[in-house]
Amino acid sequence: MMSWMIALSTVQVHANSELWSSYLTQPEKWPQKSALAKQDILPLPAAAIVDKDLAELGRILFHTPSLSKTGDISCASCHRPSVGFSDPTRVSIGINGQEGHRNSPSLLNVDLWDVLFWDGRSTELHIQATDPLNHPSEMGATPQHAEEQVQNLPALTQAWQKAYPDKKVNWPDMALALAEFQTTLRGADTAFDVFYRYAKNQDYAKAKRALTDTQLLGMHIYRTKAGCVNCHNGELFSDQEFHNTGLHYFGRRFEDLGTYELTKIPADMGKFRTPMLRHLAQTSPWMHNGLFDDLKGIVRMYSNGGARPRRPKDLDSMLDFPITSDILVPFDMSKKEEVALLEFLKIL
């Protein structure tokens, strides 16, 4: 029995050694990633340089509940700093206790997004700011109301004068200040970022100390057999594209057809922007509707090829039905590989 255990341990050490050897090299020489991925996973870039006075005005605006119609909802109500500027409730709560129908995503690294919101309805941070301000179930206010708050609150008036000494209070410039503040919300380097940079600089001794054996195996599974990298790649661990994972609840109480609600293109039914996988440990629940609070459940859903609702039998044949993306295919994992993948996701 003892000799069998020693032999098994020797095989395991050899496997770990081989995997480390394949990754203790420059990233472009790492094992081939899944063929469907347009790019590999990448570290965060350096934070942008910002106007400090403008960002400070934006910070105060972000935390000011009186911008809302009822005076009790601020940007920070749904993007809480303590949880990675995300919302720990399944769906966000607006004025008068109204429930939204989507979970508020993290604002960390938000300046790196090409498209904003789950449905991609905005491409600019300063333009995006008007949407929650106006939305009747979020802040329920108007730009004019927001301008009045700056004029009436001493802290905001002072911050405005420092940021815009020669301008009258106006909403477009308030929105620019909010965008400037959000540009400062860069997440801290993760163990992956540290590993990548040391590997890139060929400092392999330090690279090896950045990840555990289990985390490295998880990264390998992520990039290869699990195919996570197909959609979750780049600096944000998101391809910034739109996919249907089958969680649209078509024809049911919580139906949400995603970007189709904007485009009215049948192929867009049920599609949502690929979420960032950075800061997962801080930002549960996950998915556009806050459906999951356990990463294992998400991993197992995808290992089965995603959710695949059936077309209702009574649905008129002339009507469209959202189809789960064919980029999602089932894959097999051992228990050890599943644990490793989860450990890697938790350090992002």
Task: Please annotate each region the language model reported.
Residues 1-9:
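Bacterial N-terminal signal peptides
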Residues 11-348:
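Periplasmic c-type cytochrome electron-transfer domains
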